[in-house]
Swiss-Prot record:
Protein's name in the database: Cyanate hydratase
SMART domains (UniProt xref): Cyanate_lyase
Residue pairs linked by disulfide bridges in the UniProt entry: none
Catalysed reaction, written as an equation: cyanate + hydrogencarbonate + 3 H(+) = NH4(+) + 2 CO2
Function summary: Catalyzes the reaction of cyanate with bicarbonate to produce ammonia and carbon dioxide.
GO biological process terms, semicolon-separated: cyanate metabolic process
Alphabetical UniProt keywords: Lyase
Gene3D superfamilies: Cyanate lyase, C-terminal domain (3.30.1160.10), lambda repressor-like DNA-binding domains (1.10.260.40)
Length: 154
C-alpha cells in the first residue's frame, strides 16, 4: 500500500493544517480512501481538505479529530476558517502529474467549452456545486487507466 505524504518543502504555501493532517495520516498509515470512508466523503474531497482547498464542516472536524487523534480544538482553529483556494500550485505547475492535468485543460479546454455550450447553451460549469472522483480501470491487456470524473452544475 502506498500512502500520499506531504513534503512541506515542495509545498511552502499550504496552510498549517496540511502539516498537522498529513503528519497524523502518516503516523496512522491511512489512505485517503480510508479517511474518506470515515468522514463520509469521497477520497478527492477528503484530500482537498488536507491540502486546504476545501472547507471542513464541523462534522468533518470531529471525525478527523477522532480518527487521527488530533485534539478537536486544534483542528477547529486550523480548519475553522475559509480555505484560500488555489495558492498551493504555481503556474504553470512543475509537478508532472499536476502539469498533465493543466495540459489537458490547455489542450482540450476550448473543445470542452464548445461541446458544453452546444449541449447546455451559454453558461459555465460550477466549481462550487461540484463533485469529482478518481477510479481505476484495467483493460483486457492488463494496462491500468485513470478515470477522472468532473461533475458540475450548469
Amino acid at each position: 500500500m502506498s500512502l500520499a505524504t506531504l513534503d512541506a518543502t515542495q509545498h511552502p504555501n499550504l496552510p498549517q493544517s496540511s502539516q498537522t493532517l498529513f503528519s497524523a495520516k502518516a503516523t496512522k498509515k491511512l489512505t485517503f480512501e480510508q479517511i474518506a470512508q470515515h468522514i463520509g466523503r469521497n477520497e478527492v474531497a477528503a484530500a482537498a481538505i488536507f491540502y486546504g482547498q476545501a472547507k471542513a464542516s464541523p462534522e468533518d472536524i470531529e471525525k478527523l479529530s477522532s480518527l487521527l487523534d488530533i485534539p478537536t480544538p486544534v483542528l477547529e482553529e486550523q480548519l475553522g476558517g475559509f480555505p484560500d483556494r488555489g495558492r498551493s500550485v504555481e503556474m504553470p505547475p512543475k509537478e508532472p502529474l499536476i502539469y498533465r492535468l493543466y495540459e489537458i485543460v490547455q489542450n482540450y479546454g476550448y473543445a470542452y467549452k464548445a461541446v458544453l455550450n452546444e449541449k447546455f447553451g451559454d453558461g459555465i460549469m460550477s466549481a462550487i456545486s461540484f463533485s469529482t472522483k478518481v477510479e481505476k480501470e484495467t483493460d483486457a491487456d492488463g494496462n491500468n487507466w485513470a478515470v477522472i470524473t468532473l461533475r458540475g452544475k450548469w
